[in-house]
Amino acid sequence: MSTPTTPLSYKDAGVDIDAGNALVNNIKSAVKRTRRPEVMGNLGGFGALCELPTKYKHPVLVSGTDGVGTKLRLAIDYKKHDNVGVDLVAMCSNDLIVSGAEPLFFLDYYATGKLDVEVATAVVKGIAEGCVQSGCALIGGETAEMPGMYEGDDYDLAGFCVGVAEKEEIIDGTKVQDGDALIALASSGPHSNGFSLIRKVLEVSKADPEQELAGKPLIDHLLEPTKIYVKSLLKLIEEHDVHAMSHITGGGFWENIPRVLPEDCKAVVKSDSWQWPVVFNWLMEKGNISEFEMYRTFNCGVGMVVALPADKVESALNLLNAEGEKAWLIGDIAKRSGDEEQVEIL
């Protein structure tokens, strides 16, 4: 047995506590921007505290967790770290709003082999920006520096969001019925899904991600931050009887819309009601991807679908467009019989 001639430290093993402290100092002002009045205490405690808003008579907590998937691979490779934090919050908070829940607080998990304070600061500032857009507080998180677990500059992210809904007003799809209208809310791009296929298309087509597409680099189309719909949909819920909402994520139209439909209903989507953003046409062409696979993998320009009574379409569209959304009538709900698919795209 041999003994080192000089004392070993945690830093010698690859964990830099001082770098972690520097990160905390860098993000304090960004985190402060996200604070809600219900939050108790400050950043850095063992457990984060948050009261329930007093306006709820029968509050129900709604939780969600998600990541950014292999979109991170492109962000890391092209050193574009500013927006993946927004993506992380969007993937969680957009899931919560589907139930009609108001996001309350968010926690993040950042794991890497060697902590790069500059990169981590950019990521967490993006998380804070996503929280501001969602109206939720960033109340805590974990930065894990784990030498030997990640190669080079690689890191991974996970997010955890908790929201609250009035028990009697939870949106669960049970009110969906034949004749309801379907409204689409535009996406900002691929959002955070389908990136393993996107990377495969880049590989087989040998395309340069820096090439120009419709006035900006292809990589910027691909890494455009996920649209956060929370505030505009909370406003819509407040003023309209929303029957269901579907966040179009992994699984696309075919998998996500049926998650909020009764068994005896199907969604009839009119594909001529919108034009795909150019990046989806590029992916379809360069990857020789079938239309079915496009709708199963990507959002194809639709980030959220809302079902509500047909006579409320005009007022709902006016509200959403006034809130800054690009929204349109994309189809309707019809009766489903036998073994019919629950999504029909015409």
UniProtKB/Swiss-Prot annotation:
Subcellular location: Cytoplasm
Superkingdom of source: Bacteria
EC number: 6.3.3.1
Keywords recorded for this protein, A-Z: ATP-binding, Cytoplasm, Ligase, Nucleotide-binding, Purine biosynthesis
GO cellular component, as recorded: cytosol
Pathway: Purine metabolism; IMP biosynthesis via de novo pathway; 5-amino-1-(5-phospho-D-ribosyl)imidazole from N(2)-formyl-N(1)-(5-phospho-D-ribosyl)glycinamide: step 2/2
Protein name per Swiss-Prot or TrEMBL: Phosphoribosylformylglycinamidine cyclo-ligase
Gene name tied to this protein: purM
